[in-house]
């Protein structure tokens, strides 16, 4: 079968088939969010998962985006602008995938830029995630250490390395370099690409990790029966520590990371240094907390927090 005929034959896939293929190429969190987005588009009757992709050739993308952005109430609930933009992003990303899948037979959606009808625009300058002070997270960690030593180490790595929870839970013992007090993290980039970043940690924290792993191989953070730790297990122990330490806000891995970022800004670290440590993509991303090409492994040494 010729190449052109092969790509044209993909038009006989259903939207449901194509969406499953697309979602399988995404990272866990993105897949979860976009799966919800696809269901939303189906509920709005923008997509019919039983239809073949032939219908996509005649789809009016502008009308679809307008329908998403014009929605004020869905299932009895007010739809926020952030939610509308997230659903629009899902639709655009999906059509771009269909464009690649069919080698151009299906045209991708393009964000609207008409005055008063723009698909994407800045909603807020600040990240809504709450934060705590260094003194507060110190108290929280004291409680967490008693509740669960493993999750105490996870929390310390989040704060000290400015890392996301999934980056920590995916660590393997061969990512730990005790001789140099460094840890190699795999950072997910766009289009499922990965890069690595080497971060130097305080000797005391690395010694605690060495005692915890005790020479075993495989995943660093495991349960009592040796299986990888889940985010729900960490969340449960965080809630207990939050209660015992009498925190005024809900403490999540996201809150800890945001708190560490804000603290670095407060102690005078430059935006460029914070970007290198945290892997944030822009100064705007850094500032929002406070007022694609793969490269060689990066080495960062954040200040001791």
Curated annotation (Swiss-Prot):
Outcome when changing residue 28 to Y: In plasmid pCHL1
PROSITE patterns: CB, TYR_RECOMBINASE
Domain Tyr recombinase, chain residue ranges per copy: 127-305
Positions of the Core-binding (CB) domain: 13-99
Active site: 188, 257, 289
Keyword vocabulary terms for this entry: DNA integration, DNA recombination, DNA-binding, Plasmid, Viral genome integration, Virus entry into host cell
One GO process term, biological-process aspect: symbiont entry into host cell
Source superkingdom: Bacteria
Gene Ontology MF terms in the entry: DNA binding
Keyword Lyase: no
Record family assignment: Belongs to the 'phage' integrase family.
Additional comment: pGP7-D is required for growth within mammalian cells.
Protein name: Virulence plasmid integrase pGP7-D
Source species of the chain: Chlamydia trachomatis
